[in-house]
Amino acid sequence: MEHAVPDDALARGLEYLRRNGTELMGVLAAHSAGIASGDDVLVHLRPYQNDDGGWERFDGDMEGSLSTISQTWLGLQWLLWTRPSDTTPLDRTVEFLRRSQHDDGYWDEPEEILKYDPPPWMIPGDFSNRLWLTSAVCCKLLELGREAAVGLDAAIEYLRKGWDGSRFPGGQHTHWMAVYIFASLSEPTDLDRRIARGCASRLIDELSKGIGDALDVTSIAYVAFRSGTRDLFDVAFPIVVGNQAEDGGWTTGYDDIHRPQCTIEAMHLIKMV
């Protein structure tokens, strides 16, 4: 099934970000539009990577310069999408994630984050938060082909323990990440196949009912495309296309501060498809 995209979608998105985004958001959009290189992007990415290899301060969800898992996986995503010729930032990011993995296989935010009044999805010690952070890291490392750098088997086993037969605790994040993770394993078990299919079916049902923020729907369409989960993609992608607003940017219910990121992710998906 083919899905129509307006011819000017990328140009309108780029113009929106030139008016409303930071320099980083603008160059990421230019990369998505095919007019900036990964090396151009890296110039603007570098200030967000800390000395320990972790990343901070991308999305405005909290103050401070602490390296967090939720920001580091986003930095990993930008490096994955833009592929700068200097791989040192990527290597440092992967090493930070290797050091940050807990013995039981999961990732969690550091306790120090509590000093900065983080949002609920960044509170350490919460099982559902650990699941989505672990799934986020695994998803991007698998896509990069760098999963051997961490204890992937332990991380996957931790995720399996969160599956109750029909869903993971928490929101949609762990579910859409799990679609890609459990479809990408070289030797999946029957449980892994059930998890991948169960997550896809759940997301299809929720999207069909209008459940899901625009930013998350873009991520869902992305992993569906990358994993070859066509039925999920056929539901999610038309919603993504329809979420472009009159001003050229993509909508999100999280907050206007997240619209530039939402716009970049939608542009990248459209270019890739």
Question: Which residue ranges define each predicted feature?
Answer:
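Preference for long, amphipathic alpha-helical scaffolds in soluble/luminal domains
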Residues: 1-273
